[in-house]
Amino acid sequence: MSTAANEPSRSRGKAPAGERVADWADGRLGIYSLAKANMRKIFPDHWSFMLGEVCLYSFIIIILTGVYLTLFFHPSMAEVEYHGSYVPLQGQMMSEAYASTLDISFDVRGGLLIRQIHHWAALIFLAGMFVHMMRVFFTGAFRKPREVNWLFGFLLLVLGMFTGFTGYSLPDDLLSGTGIRFMEGAILSVPIVGTYISFFLFGGEFPGHDFVSRFYSIHILLLPGIMLGLLVGHLILVFYHKHTQFAGPGKTNKNVVGMPLLPVYTAKAGGFFFLVFGVISVVSAIATINPIWAIGPYRPDQVSTGAQPDWYMGFSEGLIRVMPGWEINAWGHTLVLGVFVPLLIFPLVLAAIAVYPFIESWVTGDKREHHILDRPRNAPTRTAFGVAWLTVYFVLLIGGGNDLWATHFHLSINAITWFVRIAFFVGPVVAFIATKRICLGLQRRDKDKVLHGRESGIIKRLPHGEFIEVHEPLSQEQLHTLTAHEQYQPAEIGPTVDENGVERKVSGTQKLRAKLSESYYGEESQIPKPTVEEYKEITSGHGHH
């Protein structure tokens, strides 16, 4: 009996090695059930969804190149005499950090290219994060249930900014040292504890002997570790919540229309990773960035002219450059408002985008889950707020480079500074009003297209001599896209008296919420969609085409 029972297994033969490994792993990790649940997960297809992937792939490139650079970088401020390959600096005294960075650039095989890739990838990572978050903001992808994922993305952006700052400060060149000096001045402006924080960070009086080693630990361990955890959590929530999608035929809040993870999306993502890596490598090979050998080592008594931080920190410098040099002297102490006030505004500018999802949820009272994205024009108030924030950001970027604007365009630096000061307050208001009006105009245009069709460019002469332009009807897909958005009613305070005729108390918070809700969904904030009756009347021949 045993011989007969074992005969089928002998005829089948031994399973392939890959299958045996998979069976072994499944018996211990349960990968079959995990793969079954996620490998056929559907991802919608839209170019804007690739922005998040640019961030992910740039982060991977940063880690890979960063590991290589750590093998040769010496995070020490000990003074050494340089005897490397770069002749103009031979015999100069400099820190080990600066000398090792020169060695990476000129003596390590491929070192300069890796340095450039690392720096360019960091810039592209932060630019991708910035644009990705703006896409999420303007399309309303932060709404329930994705508020936590929005905060994860916000923290990744902020931590990425500080990781980049600590990274380009490590070479201890004159430009990075100027940035460190800038940071030290901001820290010293903090009342009471500023001096203690500065001494702790630098290990004594600036520049001290410890900040490179401390920044090194923060740059390669602390911040990347936190960012990696946030990134994993961000991706897990993307899988858990399912991907958002733009409105279209067959698309609802309960489904996702697109391609499966395997094999289509995986193949596309793999190719896109190598495309991003290739583009960054080409840019790094032909465009020099941070040429520390041309700047020289840092000296506390020197400063670079035209010194600029990386673009993502430019708005913080703009805050300080345009702030008047006000001071308050009291009881033997000086409060430097010219630095301390910008130091307070800096986190507020960033926090404004972090808390916005919760503010909008409270104002609108909308507690439903949203998986269909908005077109920015259909949320004019939100879009106007976003453009106003961008206006503040870019105005401050101009302020951060006021000296370069002045020298390149032969302008008065004082005129630029005053322009930025005024635009900081006036610009967001003008941008808000203009953006909201543009969105409403686009809504009217969409309504007209639904009712009358698209202009064909064909001019027709009627029998009685009148000239008209022929309009072509939209496809069903286009009609669905232009009319699929929901239009909400503003929140109301309700009756002023209760059921007994007694005047009901209405809190100031309720009144504020009602007014803000009116600004979101009131008559002046959305154009009514065309009704079925209007559409039938036009398309049945009563309208004028």
Swiss-Prot record:
It is an enzyme of class 7 (translocase). Binds 2 heme groups non-covalently per subunit. Its main location: membrane. The keyword Transmembrane applies. Its cofactor is heme. It is found in: Cell membrane. It is a multi-pass membrane protein. The chain crosses the membrane at residues 54-74, 122-142, 150-170, 182-202, 220-240, 269-289, 335-355, 385-405, 413-433. Heme 2 binds at residues 132, 234. It catalyses: a quinol + 2 Fe(III)-[cytochrome c](out) = a quinone + 2 Fe(II)-[cytochrome c](out) + 2 H(+)(out). Heme 1 binds at residues 118, 219. Keywords: Cell membrane, Electron transport, Heme, Iron, Membrane, Metal-binding, Respiratory chain, Translocase, Transmembrane, Transmembrane helix, Transport. GO terms for cellular component: membrane; plasma membrane. Signal peptide: none annotated. The cytochrome bc1 complex is composed of a cytochrome b (QcrB), the Rieske iron-sulfur protein (QcrA) and a diheme cytochrome c (QcrC) subunit. Cytochrome b subunit of the cytochrome bc1 complex, an essential component of the respiratory electron transport chain required for ATP synthesis. The bc1 complex catalyzes the oxidation of ubiquinol and the reduction of cytochrome c in the respiratory chain. The bc1 complex operates through a Q-cycle mechanism that couples electron transfer to generation of the proton gradient that drives ATP synthesis. The cytochrome b subunit contains two ubiquinol reactive sites: the oxidation (QP) site and the reduction (QN) site. This is Cytochrome bc1 complex cytochrome b subunit. It comes from Streptomyces coelicolor (strain ATCC BAA-471 / A3(2) / M145).
